[in-house]
From Swiss-Prot:
Protein name: Protein PB1-F2
Disulfide bonding pattern of the chain: none
Pfam families for this protein: PB1-F2
Positions of the record's site feature: Low pathogenicity: 66
Subunit details: Oligomer. Interacts with human SLC25A6/ANT3 and VDAC1. Interacts with host MAVS.
One cellular component (GO) term of this entry: host cell cytosol
Species annotation: Influenza A virus (strain A/USA:Iowa/1943 H1N1)
Keyword Metal-binding: no
Superkingdom: Viruses
Family: Belongs to the influenza viruses PB1-F2 family.
Something else known: Is not encoded in all strains, and seems to be dispensable for replication.
One GO term (biological process): symbiont-mediated suppression of host cytoplasmic pattern recognition receptor signaling pathway via inhibition of MAVS activity
InterPro entries tied to this protein: Flu_proapoptotic_PB1-F2
Length: 90
């Protein structure tokens, strides 16, 4: 994730102590509930950033020139258009 100074929950609170992890490595230990809440918020924000990337990768995968994928893509698009037309007419 980067250096410890870069993590927002370490910068935001003074309630950080260290604990020894596996291999004797020192890791920050969150003791204050606000730090934990902020860490959860950061994870949610990261998930929101990752989601558009996943969509882009999915679209790139769909655009590959594989005959099976092209067939599936056109079939799904046809069904979607038929479904949309049906919804609009009702």
């Amino acid at each position: 994730m980067g250096q410890e100074q870069d993590t927002p929950w370490i910068l935001s609170t003074g309630h950080i102590s260290t604990q020894k992890g596996e291999g004797g490595q020192q890791t920050p230990k969150l003791e204050h509930h606000n730090s934990t809440r902020l860490m959860g918020h950061c994870q949610k924000t990261m998930n929101q950033v990752v989601m558009p990337k996943q969509i882009v990768y999915w679209k790139q995968w769909l655009s590959l020139r594989n005959p099976i994928l092209v067939f599936l893509k056109t079939r799904v698009l046809r069904r979607w258009r038929l479904f949309s037309k049906h919804e609009w007419t009702n």
